[in-house]
């Protein structure tokens, strides 16, 4: 019983770790920036795009995603 409990906890810990690492860069919800009238602030919260470009914040990243027709994805948060 102890062995199966340890195995279960280890499996859960590994799942949480890997889902956080690989899920971080998977998707960004850009719905709030779809309106072309929305202007981006100069807030610094870097996003690294799959194109190797560092975008200043989520808004700037989302505008680039829309301009590219969805070809750019989030590689990770932070500078490239």
UniProtKB/Swiss-Prot annotation:
Q: List the disulfide bonds.
A: 30-62, 40-59, 48-80
Give compartment(s): Secreted
Note the InterPro entries from the entry. Kazal-type_SerProtInhib, Kazal_dom, Kazal_dom_sf
Q: In which tissues is it expressed?
A: Seminal plasma.
- What Pfam family does this protein match (any one)? Kazal_1
**Chief site of localization:** secreted
Q: Which GO terms describe its molecular function?
A: serine-type endopeptidase inhibitor activity
PROSITE patterns to which the protein is assigned, alphabetical: KAZAL_1 (PS00282), KAZAL_2 (PS51465)
Q: Which domain of life is it from?
A: Eukaryota
UniProt entry keywords in alphabetical sequence: Disulfide bond, Protease inhibitor, Pyrrolidone carboxylic acid, Secreted, Serine protease inhibitor, Signal
Domain Kazal-like residue range list: 24-80
Q: Which GO terms describe its cellular component?
A: extracellular region
Carrying Pyrrolidone carboxylic acid, the residues are 24
Quote the record's miscellaneous comment.
The sequence of BUSI-IIA is shown.
Q: What does this protein do?
A: Serine protease inhibitor selective for kallikreins. Efficiently inhibits KLK4, KLK5, KLK6, KLK7, KLK12, KLK13 and KLK14. Doesn't inhibit KLK8. Inhibits acrosin, trypsin, and chymotrypsin.
Q: What is this protein called?
A: Serine protease inhibitor Kazal-type 6
Task: Name its species.
Answer: Bos taurus
